[in-house]
Amino acid sequence: MSKQRIYEYAKELNLKSKEIIDELKSMNIEVSNHMQALEDDQIKALDKKFKKEQKNDNKQSTQNNHQKSNNQNQNKGQQKDNKKNQQQNNKGNKGNKKNNRNNKKNNKNNKPQSQPAAPKEIPSKVTYQEGITVGEFADKLNVESSEIIKKLFLLGIVANINQSLNQETIELIADDYGVEVEEEVVINEEDLSIYFEDEKDDPEAIERPAVVTIMGHVDHGKTTLLDSIRHTKVTAGEAGGITQHIGAYQIENDGKKITFLDTPGHAAFTTMRARGAQVTDITILVVAADDGVMPQTIEAINHAKEAEVPIIVAVNKIDKPTSNPDRVMQELTEYGLIPEDWGGETIFVPLSALSGDGIDDLLEMIGLVAEVQELKANPKNRAVGTVIEAELDKSRGPSASLLVQNGTLNVGDAIVVGNTYGRIRAMVNDLGQRIKTAGPSTPVEITGINDVPQAGDRFVVFSDEKQARRIGESRHEASIVQQRQESKNVSLDNLFEQMKQGEMKDLNVIIKGDVQGSVEALAASLMKIDVEGVNVRIIHTAVGAINESDVTLANASNGIIIGFNVRPDSGAKRAAEAENVDMRLHRVIYNVIEEIESAMKGLLDPEFEEQVIGQAEVRQTFKVSKVGTIAGCYVTEGKITRNAGVRIIRDGIVQYEGELDTLKRFKDDAKEVAKGYECGITIENYNDLKEGDVIEAFEMVEIKR
């Protein structure tokens, strides 16, 4: 039987749709409206119910038809009485129709009343989501909302049907009904970090190649070392391929692959970490044997330590006559990097990137450190990873270099990359070869996304392209909203508030000073500050001006910068404003300690400075009883505002300082009066105004620290 709508079925039986709906509801069948389609079993049930009425209607109709037929037979051949009989027949038919209507009406009235639905049983267990309302919880328990509201009232809670319930209240009410409750954890699919899991406990996880970043001071041989490793380990078959610069490359050593990130120094490393990406497994710190520890070397050490990544020191340029590897080891011990030969845990490898000496030893050490770390991934999982580089190519459109961290990436996969999305059209490896799949720790360049992502953005593959599009668009909209909001980086002004909310455990501090002695003294003094709830943690100290790299580190570590007798350069100023990084510049150590200690205790009062906003000359005075002296004034400079502080100046000497009482233009109150206009002014608690006096208006403006 084909599906019928309720109104069609009612029309067939010459009934109202409401009667059918009422009957369905009495059968505990949910009905939304008369347009709802009826299932076969529902039609059968309705047929049984209305069968008697239908039979009665049919029987009555048959009798009427039979009577009409007899009348027609009797009228044959009787021409004279035709009209009379016809009129009688018509009357009879009208009477029959009337009877039919009465019968139907009686049938409707005699129809059995629908029985009220039996109350539903209270379930033994229900699940709920955070923020569930009284009405929603009542529906889950199959009880009236008024019952829940009564129970809440007995608990001392006045609530309505739309009131949200907390976990404790839900458990109390459920316990009263003997129902077990369980909270549903709603997973935000737009948060890509939930797809990144530790694979060590996965039984199907297998060993993956280590990801290595090379950092160090300028001209210490980072690029030469990268080139030397690459050229030493590229096989004959690969040598013919055109090298594709995708920000990373893979080599093979003793049957095991190693992935090197070819990033421009530690700035990119920190930028990626600031976006939440942790891609590096091992850091190679390159130090020239003839130059020793330099400022960028120290920065690289601090960046690697902040990321909690193991460090292998590569002492380069040992083939130079002026090289002194022992001096390098000695200098690095000051920064916690103690060689294994001296009883420490840091691996030192002397090498020459130019000649290739020691390269094999370095690769062997990388393999050992990777083995200890037990780096694993599951190639069968969905592909997830991080963006290394991204650009807009004129011919290919947006492209991104990705590092696959888990799972296997395939051409044709629907992907979300940061706030962008798309379907992978093509995939190229570091040798410029087109590939179809890429496993864990493999760097690839892809095309097919709708926009250019940022370095450090995460990517996740989804099975459905519509889902990827929806998530990508939602993330893009959310990022626009987030950019409009102020950054939540810590500052001394909001430090105590973050401490109260439990957001701050450590106050990360970067100290830059004019001389090493001052820097060390300041660091030691700050470490002695003892405030319950937060610790001062010095993450970087150096001599010299505050630079952009310091701001980048502070932003990544959610820290502040203290400059002692030094100033930030132009790049650092711009970066600090863009990232909302707090910089404090001081000349006295005591002031630094006092300011930070006060901030940690929540006692840091805002500083204000006075700003003169206008002057008015008293042209005439009027004495009014119960009001005092009214000064008719002319604004000569700036403006006079109603909420401003004022001082009365006579012959260059301040006579009084206080507040405005009234400010009027003609007879109307005014919020402000600009230069060139006249106004009437009264001063609170001061009536000794004279012609020629100058009323100076000022405001107290908070100094931005």
From Swiss-Prot:
Its main location: cytoplasm. Residues 59-77 have a biased composition (Low complexity). Residues 40-124 are annotated as: Disordered. Residues 316-319 are annotated as: G4. GO terms for molecular function: GTP binding; GTPase activity; translation initiation factor activity. Keywords: Cytoplasm, GTP-binding, Initiation factor, Nucleotide-binding, Protein biosynthesis. Residues 216-223 are annotated as: G1. It is found in: Cytoplasm. GTP binds at residues 216-223, 262-266, 316-319. Residues 41-58 have a biased composition (Basic and acidic residues). Residues 94-108 have a biased composition (Basic residues). The keyword Nucleotide-binding applies. Residues 207-376 form the tr-type G domain. PROSITE patterns: G_TR_2, IF2. Residues 352-354 are annotated as: G5. It holds the Pfam family IF2_N. The keyword Membrane does not apply. Residues 262-265 are annotated as: G3. Residues 241-245 are annotated as: G2. One of the essential components for the initiation of protein synthesis. Protects formylmethionyl-tRNA from spontaneous hydrolysis and promotes its binding to the 30S ribosomal subunits. Also involved in the hydrolysis of GTP during the formation of the 70S ribosomal complex. Belongs to the TRAFAC class translation factor GTPase superfamily. Classic translation factor GTPase family. IF-2 subfamily. HAMAP family: IF_2_B (MF_00100_B). This is Translation initiation factor IF-2. It comes from Staphylococcus aureus (strain MRSA252). The gene is infB.
